[in-house]
Amino acid sequence: TTLILDILKGYAPVVVTQNYFPEYIQLSALLAFLGHIFPFWLKFKGGKGVATYLGILLALSYSLGFLFMFTWVVVSLIFRYSSLSSMFSSLTVLVITFFRENAVKAINPDFIFAADIKLILFIFFILIIFTHRKNISNLKNRTEQKIKL
């Protein structure tokens, strides 16, 4: 249930914003993401943001959301590290969005906010790397827990 609720934390505000205030989609996505990672009621110590990011992606573009999930599953099956899968999936979405105009058009057919969307996805990627800094250290030291399949 935590996974579903965290996905909804990203999905719901972006969908509402798309329908009522489309010019604020990027701001809505950013605030939902930051609110998950840095909640003030938990002294700014929240989650890693991956599920919320997935919810945001699904709200912006199902194709990018499914790309993220597909990449996560493939990397998880190969390496069995959730953290590595999350970071690599985020990088994959970022790279596809930067180099494939069709990916940006899937988010916004009018192509009005293309640069903003790319910037927001870049910020999300940086923040996901930031929230995984302990995991990165564990991966380097070979102490990261593997996913049990």
Language-model features and meaning:
Residues 1-9, 38-51, 78-88, 131-149:
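Interhelical loop and helix-boundary elements at the membrane-water interface
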Residues 107-149:
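C-terminal membrane-associated helical module and adjoining short loops/tails
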Residues 11-12, 22-45, 50-59, 68, ...:
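Anionic-ligand binding patches
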Residues 25-30, 54, 66-70, 87-91, ...:
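Hydrophobic alpha-helical transmembrane segments
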Residues 17-21, 50-79, 91-101:
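Interfacial segments of multi-pass membrane proteins
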Residues 14-15, 41, 77, 94, ...:
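Membrane-embedded alpha-helical segments of multi-pass transporters/permeases
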Residues 10-27, 58-65, 99-120:
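Helix-coil boundary and interhelical linker segments in multi-pass alpha-helical membrane proteins
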